[in-house]
Amino acid sequence: MMLKKWLRCSSCVLLVVFALAAHVYAGGGYFAMGYGPIAWQLAGAVTAVSEDAFAGASNPAKLSMAGNQLDLSLTLLNPNRKVERTGASGPASGYNFSSTSANSLFLVPEFAYSRQVNEQVAIGISAYANGGMNIEYGDSSGIPATNLNPALCGTKPGNFAGGCGKLGFDMGQFIVAPTLAWQFAPGQSLGISPLLTLQMFKAYGLQAFAPSSRSPRHVTNNGQDYAFGAGVRVGWFGEFKPCLSLGAAYSSKVYMQDFDKYKGLLAEGSFDIPANYSVGMAIKPRHGWLLAFDIQRIEFSGVRALSNGILPSLTNPVANPLGSKSGSGFGWQRDQTNYKLGVMYQATPQLTLRAGYTYGKRANDNDLNSVSFGVLAVNPIRAASVGMTWKTDSGSELHMGFARMDGAKYKGPSAIFPGAKESARPYAYAVNIAWSQAM
């Protein structure tokens, strides 16, 4: 009976999160910097830190230490992205312009619940999201008949990618993670979380790429499309001394259904969530202080829609049409390693202060095989965060955190307009507020 209620709750939460959370800005590729208020404040360095019920989003084994708890979290995101092209010559000179994304303010809710069944077993659920590839560039060349596909665009001016009208992507991944943790020895736990995923995707303004596709009608401007998928996360958590805890977690690739409306755009027609894993350590050097350090690895190279280079479909669309296994992708050809450092200080019995920093080298290169799609989905490579928790007289906790995410300027040669240079530099601000209650 409890299992049925647990699974039914998972389905309800998935629908709620999907309805409310359409965008997340990234701290590791398009992965969020962290999930839940503690992770936001510690810049994601929580593989070995058990402070809330969001274990299913990082390390399911930590749930053994969470007790009976409810966490509600809301993040206000303010991403800023601008693309620019210079150096195009001749008839293409009209494409030397810049455009700023109109998508600049999003609300992202998260939810987690944990329950201690007995001394060894805990169950719970986490709901969270990935995203960050959400852009809308409304500027154009301003010159009639400069688009690269007059069959679809007529005499309209060309947008930044050579199509017509607004240029954009809208991608969100919404994950519900029912979690089971087992404390098999004092201070030692194992955990598992099925990753039940709902994904949405929309692309528009990409008419210039339709002739290079295996299915030209399924490249752009087809509205929102949806896909379901599943994977699994497993983890281990250990407390060895009052001053030391360690953790490790592995998430399989989440295999997604194909997007029927965009099977002519995405390599293999789908957008799987890449496998990822992390190890973490938390130490308490003195009373009231905690230092946490994580290393996370995200295997972007295992998802063709992300890792395939840009050139295959542009240089040989017959052998490598868009939407095929070898078709063009975003050029994220390198797996990403993220380093995360967090510090926590309990200033008073009521007030806890936190801060964190994370860095990960960008997954794509600044070359001809990456830049033209890469500038449309460029994400930050580092982030810094600060935050606090206030414990009320009633026993509930109020959390507030602030983060800035940014990245070095991403610039390189254009694969669409020979001789031109394209660039982008993303940055974002985030404010997280949350409420926790022991149940």
Question: Each predicted region: which residue ranges?
Answer:
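Bacterial N-terminal signal peptides that target proteins for export
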Residues: 2-12
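Bacterial N-terminal signal peptides
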Residues: 10-21
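Outer-membrane beta-barrel porins/channels
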Residues: 25-40, 105-439
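Short glycine/proline- and aromatic-enriched beta-strand/turn motifs that initiate or cap beta-hairpins
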Residues: 28-50, 73-84
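A generic hydrophobic-helix recognition signal that picks specific residues
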Residues: 45, 52, 222-224
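Outer-membrane beta-barrel translocator/receptor signature
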Residues: 50-58, 63-145
